[in-house]
């Protein structure tokens, strides 16, 4: 019975019932500056900051994007460098900042591990030490590669405690 269900699952996944996704090279998207639905909506953009022209400025920025028939700008996330500013650059920047925060937190925890009261320093942050770690954390990709190649980044299996359960 197991083999029959496994075969049925393999057959279902191999010949799945969903049609394959296909992008028609943005055939249904038009520049927002030429899209009538977007042009109608852009007249009603609200000012979201103290700047009285913030709605107009935002409409001008979105005008260079591609809009669908409903008049909303669409993100193009297919990896083409012509649309790198839409998704690729912000996502790489997000990953860099998230890695920086993680690396700084890791190095802070490693440093306070040797102090006389590490649990308390996790609760009450040692601000001078944290700032020192934050300022040095911008080169975290190079430091991570250096620690990985030296073997300090990954612990041996024998050094990892396991629960007796």
UniProtKB/Swiss-Prot annotation:
It comes from Synechocystis sp. (strain ATCC 27184 / PCC 6803 / Kazusa). This is Photosystem I reaction center subunit III. InterPro entries: PSI_PsaF, PSI_PsaF_sf. The keyword Nucleotide-binding does not apply. Keywords: Photosynthesis, Photosystem I, Signal. Belongs to the PsaF family. Transmembrane segments: none annotated. Pfam families: PSI_PsaF. One of its GO terms (biological process) is photosynthesis. Probably participates in efficiency of electron transfer from plastocyanin to P700 (or cytochrome c553 in algae and cyanobacteria). This plastocyanin-docking protein contributes to the specific association of plastocyanin to PSI. Residues 1-23 form the signal peptide. GO terms for cellular component: photosystem I; photosystem I reaction center; plasma membrane.
């Amino acid at each position: 019975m197991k083999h029959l269900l496994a075969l049925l699952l393999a057959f279902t996944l191999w010949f799945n019932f969903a049609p394959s996704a296909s992008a028609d090279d943005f055939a249904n998207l038009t520049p927002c500056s030429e899209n009538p639905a977007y042009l109608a909506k852009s007249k009603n953009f609200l000012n979201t900051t103290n700047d009285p022209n913030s709605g107009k400025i935002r409409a001008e920025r979105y005008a260079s994007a591609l809009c669908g028939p409903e008049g909303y700008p669409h993100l193009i996330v297919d990896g083409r460098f012509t649309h790198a500013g839409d998704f690729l650059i912000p996502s790489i920047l997000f990953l860099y900042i998230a890695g920086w925060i993680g690396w700084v937190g890791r190095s802070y925890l490693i440093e306070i591990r040797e102090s006389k009261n590490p649990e308390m320093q996790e609760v009450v942050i040692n601000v001078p030490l944290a700032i020192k770690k934050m300022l040095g954390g911008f080169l975290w990709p190079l430091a991570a590669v250096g620690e990985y190649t030296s073997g300090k980044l990954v612990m041996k299996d024998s050094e990892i405690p396991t629960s007796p359960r």
